[in-house]
């Protein structure tokens, strides 16, 4: 008997419910008809000082059990593993059933019991169902006769041609379904993918992601410089080397659209070959590794850039025609911008000044220029090719002037080596007036795989460390060098822990009274072991 709340749809209430005793029939009336009855009932009960529960209890007591024929003990069925539940005497359930209750588990499984009862008339015996939680499988606890037995037998016979069972329905978590487009465009290279990724990641995160990231300290150049380093270390090597950070930043947004789709072949350069190449180059010019520290990495950078870029341009012949002297001249140009005052004098220096001017102009131009293609054509070459070509085109006299420049530059280096403090100051000044010069150097360095190393050395140069001192790689020490380190190597381990062991001597040192012969001890131990074995056998 259910008491129905006002807002319940009467049709939602199940006709029968599987509960403890078996299947219970549910009697309910629509609320409207019953309202008066309920009111009268409650009123009466209030007057009597009773509650609904009391009524239920009394009715329960007054209902006699339906007479049950004594069950004849039939031989135990092997199939039933679940103990049949002891059925309590039928009770009158006084429950309230309204929309808050509507989804209750035991009520909502009334569909199952309904379709069972639909099989209908041929079933003589009332079926007792187990609550679902006790019912292992469909067949496990089923106590039903006849048709279920037939089903069982059929299932047993059918078990050979078992259909591949569908895996149990699992609760699905909605994962994003990967979409595969069929029109795979040109596959992005690793660099391009990284570039695309970089363009979407915020600058702070990027800083955290790029290992060994260290900006070059420099007052004048601030944010633009930082951003350009970011883009570089993100590997924007395809951005034209001549461009200044200004428009390289402009490009960084659309970098992920690979501009140079016909990518030219670049030799793969790993660190070893890179260092070797740098050694070969710095050695003949006679400027050791110190240049790199002195000049804030600039001269060495331009050279290193040359090395890589000229492999890259395929203009190797034309570049090396100038030989070391040519590169030296370029380094000198770099320096000439730092200390342009002392180098303006004299007819030979005149031409060099022209080259330097040319460089400075180009840099400024590039800063203004917008068209990336045009940047790529002149930008990449302008520092390198044009300076060099101008020098080479003028007359053979150039060679002489270059050589003198070279020497003068080395002289300057030597002076600087003697006074590292001065060099620090120099560098500071150079960086202060760095505007274009630093940018030019940056751009030359854009493609160099040595970015990080160059930056380290540059930073050293800035702080004014001694020129010879270069960033050393820290040596890892072997942690435990104790003599026992390899002892495991020679020890015989027992392969099987379970095999009986030979008896071992007691660990503690025997006290003075006990200090007996080792032989005696051993004999005792052996006797004990044997006794143990005998006991085991017994």
UniProtKB/Swiss-Prot annotation:
Q: Which tissues is it found in, per the record?
A: Widely expressed with low levels in spleen, skeletal muscle, small intestine, kidney and liver.
Q: Per the record, where are the segments of Basic residues compositional bias?
A: 119-128
Give the span(s) annotated as Disordered: 58-128, 213-473
Q: Which residues form a coiled coil?
A: 349-366, 514-535
Q: Which GO terms describe its cellular component?
A: 3M complex; centrosome; cytoplasm; cytosol; nucleoplasm; plasma membrane
Q: Please list the residue ranges that the record marks as compositionally biased, kind Low complexity.
A: 321-332, 428-438, 458-469
Query: Where does the protein end up?
Result: Cytoplasm; Cytoplasm, Cytoskeleton, Microtubule organizing center, Centrosome
**Residues modified as Phosphoserine:** 142, 146, 261
Example GO biological process term? microtubule cytoskeleton organization
Which keywords, in A-to-Z order, does the entry hold? Coiled coil, Cytoplasm, Cytoskeleton, Dwarfism, Phosphoprotein
Q: Return the motif ranges for PxLPxI/L motif.
A: 500-506
Keyword hit for Coiled coil = yes
Query: Cross-referenced InterPro entries, in alphabetical order?
Result: Coiled-coil_p8
Compositionally biased tracts (Basic and acidic residues): 301-313, 357-373, 381-392, 405-419
Domain text from the record? Answer: The PxLPxI/L motif mediates interaction with ankyrin repeats of ANKRA2.
Linked disorder reads:
3M syndrome 3: A disorder characterized by poor postnatal growth and distinctive facial features, including triangular facies, frontal bossing, fleshy tipped nose, and fleshy lips. Other features may include skeletal anomalies and prominent heels.
Query: PANTHER family given for it?
Result: COILED COIL DOMAIN-CONTAINING PROTEIN 8, CCDC8 (PTHR47741), COILED-COIL DOMAIN-CONTAINING PROTEIN 8 (PTHR47741:SF1)
Q: How does it assemble?
A: Component of the 3M complex, composed of core components CUL7, CCDC8 and OBSL1. Interacts (via PxLPxI/L motif) with ANKRA2 (via ankyrin repeats); may link the 3M complex to histone deacetylases including HDAC4 and HDAC5.
Q: What does this protein do?
A: Core component of the 3M complex, a complex required to regulate microtubule dynamics and genome integrity. It is unclear how the 3M complex regulates microtubules, it could act by controlling the level of a microtubule stabilizer. Required for localization of CUL7 to the centrosome.
- Could you tell me what this protein is called? Coiled-coil domain-containing protein 8
Organism equals: Homo sapiens (Human)
Its encoding gene is what? Answer: CCDC8
